[in-house]
Amino acid sequence: MARRPLVMGNWKLNGSKAFTKELIAGLKAELADVKGCDVAIAPPVMYLAEAEAALAGQSVIALGAQNVDVNVQGAFTGDISTEMLKDFGAKYIIIGHSERRTYHKECDTFIAKKFAALKAAGLVPVLCIGETEAENEAGQTEAVCAKQIDAVIDALGVEAFNGAVIAYEPIWAIGTGKSATPAQAQAVHAFIRGHIAAKSQAVADQVIIQYGGSVNDANAAELFTQPDIDGALVGGASLKAPAFAVIVKAAEKAKA
């Protein structure tokens, strides 16, 4: 089946009120004619109100967020709930990013609980998976990815991936300027889809698998020619409207 590509910008810990308004204005101008690719941005949660207001009146760019907690309300200082994100119109929610796994010690079981919370709230989980450089060099890429996916399947069943997104991010390629070759990335994406297909071909056929390892305006087009790369989770290049637009349009063209 034809999967509609998704390109999502992860702003990480960047921006301000003014930056949010300015970047979204640039994105709206650059992406006004895009029809064949879904687009989302995940600003810092502090700026969701500015982003929601700036995105009003258009339907090309959806709003997302970079994290969520498993609790809906209560005495959980500093946390953000699914209901709060929905209140701002956020749809695509990143979980399991390597920076959360590394700096905040989030484990597969906890991330699976976040996945469940998002599904229960009717939001779209963007589950990040991927291996470190050491794991890559030790030939453990597939085992690591399978383990991270299986945490969700074991808790919720393979059907949980209906309408969900997986972002394969080789950790050694994030923010380093290194990137897997298109063939390397495709091989892992094909493995991920095959791993899910072993439980359900129908679920595997529809799940969006993004690539998230230093995607930029120079390497995007070649990555998107690969059959199992359904878009990108973009970091640094998402902070510049022209560069992000090139990536979106490359996905739209490749998957037309």
Curated annotation (Swiss-Prot):
EC number: 5.3.1.1
Keyword tags: Cytoplasm, Gluconeogenesis, Glycolysis, Isomerase
Database matches in InterPro entries: Aldolase_TIM, TIM_sf, TrioseP_Isoase_bac/euk, Triosephosphate_isomerase, Triosephosphate_isomerase_AS
Molecular function terms from GO: triose-phosphate isomerase activity
Positions that bind substrate: 10-12, 175, 214, 235-236
Pathway note: Carbohydrate biosynthesis; gluconeogenesis; Carbohydrate degradation; glycolysis; D-glyceraldehyde 3-phosphate from glycerone phosphate: step 1/1
Enzyme class: isomerase
GO cellular component: cytosol
Subcellular localization, as worded in the UniProt entry: Cytoplasm
A Pfam family hit: TIM
Family matches, as CDD domains: TIM
Active site: 97, 169
Catalysed reactions listed for this entry: D-glyceraldehyde 3-phosphate = dihydroxyacetone phosphate
Subunit structure of this chain's protein: Homodimer.
Function: Involved in the gluconeogenesis. Catalyzes stereospecifically the conversion of dihydroxyacetone phosphate (DHAP) to D-glyceraldehyde-3-phosphate (G3P).
Family membership noted in the UniProt record: Belongs to the triosephosphate isomerase family.
Identification of the protein by name: Triosephosphate isomerase
Species of provenance: Actinobacillus pleuropneumoniae serotype 5b (strain L20)
Lineage: Bacteria, Pseudomonadati, Pseudomonadota, Gammaproteobacteria, Pasteurellales
Name of the coding gene: tpiA
